[in-house]
Design a protein with these regions (language model features):
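Structural detector of coil-to-beta-strand junctions
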Residues: 143-145, 169-171, 193, 216-218, ...
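N-terminal signal peptide c-region/cleavage motif recognized by signal peptidases
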Residues: 39-40
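Sec-dependent signal peptide recognition
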Residues: 25-33
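Right-handed parallel beta-helix
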Residues: 127, 132-135, 150-161, 176-190, ...
């Protein structure tokens, strides 16, 4: 079957004859949208002709946007395409839908639960939403590449690499901007689970579960022997991470270089080497996050993680000491290379990050490592956001709702930030 574009107009049920108050009719008209939001089988064509803000399940998703990526609208105002095949390629597949999405704004949905084993990475063009709500959709062995694309939303998907090849679950690169990654479940990639790099900016990553992987996330990536060669290109990066769950990982939760980063209300739990890492004049506000680890816990790593260098590595032996290491010391990840190259390249920039830490919670054997350093250079978010004080109850909520879970997650009632209305 071919991918098909939804063209059925939104149907508002007529009031039954003899029903004077219209209450039952008004209730019934919203059932398709409500079923979709809460994991039911309703499809877009049952409630909306096109993905615009009059469509209840479209507007419900867009209301969850926060942070630097909040301007992303994906396929809003375009057309629906429904994926009907679970094959890697051919008619009705997700790959075919993404090829069609190059023609204009597209909101992609799925006709049924699907497990799609990929032969190679999928490329996501500009003005695209991939929306797995209401279905259980899993991409296996490879993931999604967002390269030079603008205005992209990825929500409610599982991506499992099974450690089968050196690739990423989500790679945002090459000047991409206005990207929102929401409610994904990402695991077992031999390279990284998520990158934001190479001049990409205005990205929000929210309510996503990162687990069972080694090198989890890079926010910018130094690819030159001259550490600051691409500083002007990459320092424009602005990334928000909130309400994400990093569980049973090894390191880089995340690792940030250059750029402006806001991390709030994330849960890091059971890392095997270290939690976060910042260096090379990254500017980061780290607030309201929860760090939890147990020095005596059992390691759940595979026998080894494959690496780009071809080295087989395992980090289980580090757990007793790593449990305390909620982060590497400021700049530690790049200090050695910086000192070796400083004279040759005449570095005047700092190898440390500019940090402001606020209201973070450390549980179990986890200990604070990072401290304020030139905090006046750290960002003051220009937007309004749903901030919650870090508590054990918040940790439980993140464990429950982060990942490819059913339905949307309501924003916290409490708001913070300079962008809030007076």
């Amino acid at each position: 079957m071919k991918s098909r574009m939804h063209s059925t107009a939104a149907a508002t049920p007529r009031q039954p004859r003899g029903l004077r108050n219209g209450g039952l009719a008004r209730a019934l008209r919203w059932l398709p949208a409500l079923a979709l939001l809460h994991g039911g089988a309703a499809l877009a064509s049952e409630s909306c002709a096109s993905p615009d803000e009059r469509c209840a399940f479209v507007s419900a998703l867009l209301q969850q946007r926060e942070g630097y990526g909040a301007k992303a609208t994906g396929g809003l105002g375009g057309r629906f395409i429904e994926v009907t095949s679970d094959q890697d390629s051919g008619p009705g597949t997700l790959r075919a839908a993404l090829a069609q999405a190059k023609k204009g704004p597209t909101w992609i949905r799925f006709a049924s639960d699907m497990t799609i084993v990929l032969d190679k990475q999928l490329r996501v063009p500009s003005n695209t939403t991939i929306d797995g709500r209401g279905r259980r959709v899993a991409l296996i062995d490879d993931g999604l590449g967002v390269y030079g694309s603008q205005n992209v939303i990825l929500t409610h998907l599982t991506i499992d690499g099974r450690l089968n090849r050196l690739t990423q679950a989500v790679n945002v690169a090459n000047g991409s901007r206005d990207v929102w990654v929401d409610h994904l479940d990402l695991s077992r990639m031999s390279d990284r689970l998520l990158n934001v790099k190479n001049g990409s900016t205005d990205v929000t990553i929210s309510w996503t579960k990162f687990h069972n992987s080694n090198k989890v996330m890079l926010l910018n990536n130094i690819t030159s022997k001259n550490l600051f060669e691409n500083y002007d290109r990459d320092a424009i990066a602005r990334v928000t991470l909130h309400h994400n769950y990093f569980f049973n990982t090894v390191q880089r939760n995340p690792r940030g270089q250059f750029g402006t980063f806001h991390l709030f209300n994330n849960l890091l739990e059971n890392w095997d080497f270290y939690g976060m890492s910042f260096s090379l004049e990254a500017k980061a506000l780290v607030e309201g996050n929860i760090f939890n680890n147990d020095a005596k816990r059992q390691c759940v790593e595979p026998e080894f993680f494959p690496t780009v260098e071809g080295v087989k590595v395992n980090y289980c032996r580090y757990i007793p000491e790593a449990a305390r290491r909620s982060a590497l010391d400021n700049g530690a990840s790049d200090e050695g290379a910086y000192q070796n190259l400083k004279a040759q390249n005449g570095y005047t920039r700092d190898y440390k990050a500019f940090l402001r830490l606020k209201d973070n919670l450390y549980l179990g054997d986890a200990k604070p490592v990072l401290q304020d350093y030139r905090p006046e250079a750290a960002p003051t978010p220009p937007y309004c956001y749903g901030y919650e004080r870090p508590t054990a109850e918040l940790a439980d909520r993140i464990r429950k709702y982060a990942g490819n879970t059913s339905g949307d997650t309501p924003l916290p009632a409490a708001r913070a930030g300079t962008g809030c209305a007076p």
